[in-house]
């Protein structure tokens, strides 16, 4: 809903900018954005995504695997396959962060990525592990050092609760909204080598 709201807000309040980008940056941008606002977002597990990729009559640069992340080429194929945005949920626990809640199957975590046509991954999130003992065991399994993150462990030690979080790639959203195809052209604060004096 948030993404749809933001895109609709931009379409309603920045028509000149969208028309400019539609004409000079990405032909069909306005339709792409309108289609996303009207789209039903598919929700599907990582395992089922890999099933689709393995059955595809496609030669992949990076072979799809149930134990790995999906590549940019896979994201592109999946958004075309479903003709719109896709929430990929229940990721393999071994490729995700230690603080993500492990699902009852003990193979996946309660994590989700949102991929959109052309741009790929736009958002990622997960339910966090609220149980200190489970979190410590997971850190040990993944060889995560406790040094420097005692404050984080204290949030579980002194009254943690069930919670989730997500992050959105701001620059990727701006790319999607404007049709600009290089992330360096949309970053608000340029990051150039040897240009940040301390």
Name each region found by the language model:
Residues 126-127, 131-198:
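Active-site pocket scaffolds in enzymes
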Residues 37, 123, 127:
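Conserved aromatic-histidine-acidic binding/catalytic patches
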Residues 114-124:
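C-terminal substrate/ligand-recognition segments
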Residues 1-116, 141-161:
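Metal-assisted phosphate- and nucleotidyl-transfer catalytic regions
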